[in-house]
């Protein structure tokens, strides 16, 4: 999965997919009452990027639905996965359940079209804080109460805080999550990736590949250089988040990687651990 980073304006959906992304990451900011409000990152953000592009969340969802609904004039067949980077650090811990509930209602109405031929992309809810695990509970229970528990088949999870992997496992246990787990690891592109290294990403890959691991997929962020792309591929990650999808696509075309990796399509289940 080539994951376009910080896609917060509607026009950027086309821009990133046309550069080679089959997945996008979108920031979601919340108001004081835990309503998802804007697709907005704000300052500071990655180097060489404009941090302040935004849309109203529901307007973005409608555009995303068009981009991922077969037969729509805006449809992109290859856009198959969307990561919502949920900026819940602005909320109190006790608001996490409400944030999940309100997020589910927004997605149900504006993305899934109340279960009636809505967008088809798989969705990852990426949460920055382990203590906000109740967001998952609120999301799940709301879809069930609204009569659409089947939509959870399209939803996965990520805790994005670079926490100790054992602690991440405990948070999932509390949330009752037993699958659909993506694990992110990384650092802003403003800091050279070698300073962080790939140790934790490799630890996540080892968990993914072990018989008793809880992780299904691992992605590394934010990668804009060819050398770092190669290192991440050598570590056998499933996804790379990038500001430059064309760079990742180029490296995947190199002879060393062409035979080993391919770009994921809609038929590749993002919740299944890939067996070599």
UniProtKB/Swiss-Prot annotation:
One Gene Ontology molecular-function label: lyase activity
UniProt tissue specificity: Expressed by the venom gland.
Domain of life: Eukaryota
Enzyme class: lyase
Family designation: Belongs to the arthropod phospholipase D family. Class II subfamily.
GO cellular component, one term: extracellular region
Matching SUPFAM superfamilies: PLC-like phosphodiesterases (SSF51695)
Cofactor binding: number and manner: Binds 1 Mg(2+) ion per subunit.
BP-aspect Gene Ontology terms: killing of cells of another organism; lipid catabolic process
UniProt-recorded name of the protein: Dermonecrotic toxin LsaSicTox-alphaIB2i
CC cofactor: Mg(2+)
Keywords from the named record: Cytolysis, Dermonecrotic toxin, Disulfide bond, Glycoprotein, Hemolysis, Lipid degradation, Lipid metabolism, Lyase, Magnesium, Metal-binding, Secreted, Toxin
Catalytic-site annotation from UniProt: 5, 41 (nucleophile)
Xref: Pfam families: GDPD_2
Glycan attachment residues as annotated in the record: 129, 253
Main function: Dermonecrotic toxins cleave the phosphodiester linkage between the phosphate and headgroup of certain phospholipids (sphingolipid and lysolipid substrates), forming an alcohol (often choline) and a cyclic phosphate. This toxin acts on sphingomyelin (SM). It may also act on ceramide phosphoethanolamine (CPE), lysophosphatidylcholine (LPC) and lysophosphatidylethanolamine (LPE), but not on lysophosphatidylserine (LPS), and lysophosphatidylglycerol (LPG). It acts by transphosphatidylation, releasing exclusively cyclic phosphate products as second products.
Catalysed reactions, as listed in the record: an N-(acyl)-sphingosylphosphocholine = an N-(acyl)-sphingosyl-1,3-cyclic phosphate + choline; an N-(acyl)-sphingosylphosphoethanolamine = an N-(acyl)-sphingosyl-1,3-cyclic phosphate + ethanolamine; a 1-acyl-sn-glycero-3-phosphocholine = a 1-acyl-sn-glycero-2,3-cyclic phosphate + choline; a 1-acyl-sn-glycero-3-phosphoethanolamine = a 1-acyl-sn-glycero-2,3-cyclic phosphate + ethanolamine
InterPro entries hit by this protein: PLC-like_Pdiesterase_TIM-brl (IPR017946)
Main location: secreted
Cysteine-cysteine disulfides: 45-51, 47-190
Record-listed E.C. numbers: 4.6.1.-
Localization (cell): Secreted
Positions contributing to Mg(2+) binding: 25, 27, 85
């Amino acid at each position: 999965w080539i994951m376009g980073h910080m896609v917060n304006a509607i026009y950027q959906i086309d821009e990133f997919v046309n550069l080679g992304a089959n997945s996008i990451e979108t920031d979601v900011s919340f108001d004081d009452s835990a309503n998802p409000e804007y697709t907005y990152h704000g300052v500071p953000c990655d180097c060489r990027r404009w941090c302040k592009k935004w849309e109203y969340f529901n307007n973005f969802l409608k555009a995303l639905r068009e981009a991922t609904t077969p037969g729509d004039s805006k449809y992109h067949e290859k856009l198959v996965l969307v990561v919502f980077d949920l900026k819940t650090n602005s909320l109190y811990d006790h608001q996490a359940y409400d944030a999940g509930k309100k997020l589910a209602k927004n997605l149900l109405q504006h993305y899934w079209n109340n279960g009636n031929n809505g967008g088809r992309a798989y969705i990852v809810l990426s949460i920055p804080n382990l203590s906000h695990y109740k967001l998952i509970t609120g999301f799940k229970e709301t879809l069930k109460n609204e009569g659409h528990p089947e939509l959870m088949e399209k939803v996965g999870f990520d805790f994005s805080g670079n926490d100790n992997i054992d602690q991440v496992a405990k948070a999932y246990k509390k949330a009752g999550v037993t699958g659909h787990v993506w694990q992110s690891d990384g650092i802003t592109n403003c800091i050279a990736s070698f300073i962080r290294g790939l140790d934790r990403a490799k630890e996540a890959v080892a968990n993914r590949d072990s018989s008793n691991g809880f992780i299904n997929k691992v992605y590394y962020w934010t990668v804009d250089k060819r050398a770092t792309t190669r290192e991440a591929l050598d570590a056998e990650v499933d996804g790379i988040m990038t500001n430059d999808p064309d760079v990742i696509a180029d490296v995947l075309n190199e002879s060393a990687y062409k035979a080993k990796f391919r770009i994921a399509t809609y038929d590749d289940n993002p919740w299944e651990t890939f067996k070599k």
